[in-house]
From Swiss-Prot:
The chain crosses the membrane at residues 29-49. One of its GO terms (molecular function) is phosphate ion binding. The gene is psbH. This is Photosystem II reaction center protein H. Keywords: Chloroplast, Membrane, Photosynthesis, Photosystem II, Plastid, Thylakoid, Transmembrane, Transmembrane helix. It is a single-pass membrane protein. One of its GO terms (biological process) is protein stabilization. Belongs to the PsbH family. HAMAP family: PSII_PsbH (MF_00752). GO terms for cellular component: chloroplast thylakoid membrane; photosystem II. InterPro entries: PSII_PsbH, PSII_PsbH_sf. One of the components of the core complex of photosystem II (PSII), required for its stability and/or assembly. PSII is a light-driven water:plastoquinone oxidoreductase that uses light energy to abstract electrons from H(2)O, generating O(2) and a proton gradient subsequently used for ATP formation. It consists of a core antenna complex that captures photons, and an electron transfer chain that converts photonic excitation into a charge separation.
Length: 67
């Protein structure tokens, strides 16, 4: 028999929802927005790395690193 703990009792409702699917699109639009925001973040980082996006007082000279 499994040991019953307070943490297990708190997490039991989450496990009861396992396998159930929300009707319709569910949270798909929210995930699409989050993925779009992450894409924009990655593009900004890439532009800073390529010096395509110039920001004042941000040095992107990678040759002066620690030797």
């Amino acid at each position: 028999m499994a040991l019953r703990t307070r943490l297990g009792e708190l997490l039991r409702p989450l496990n009861a929802e396992y396998g159930k699917v929300a009707p319709g699109w569910g949270t798909t639009p929210i995930m699409a927005v989050v993925m779009g925001a992450f894409l924009v973040f990655l593009l900004i980082i890439l532009q800073i790395y390529n010096s395509s996006l110039i920001i004042e007082n941000v040095d992107v000279d990678w040759t002066n690193g620690i030797v």
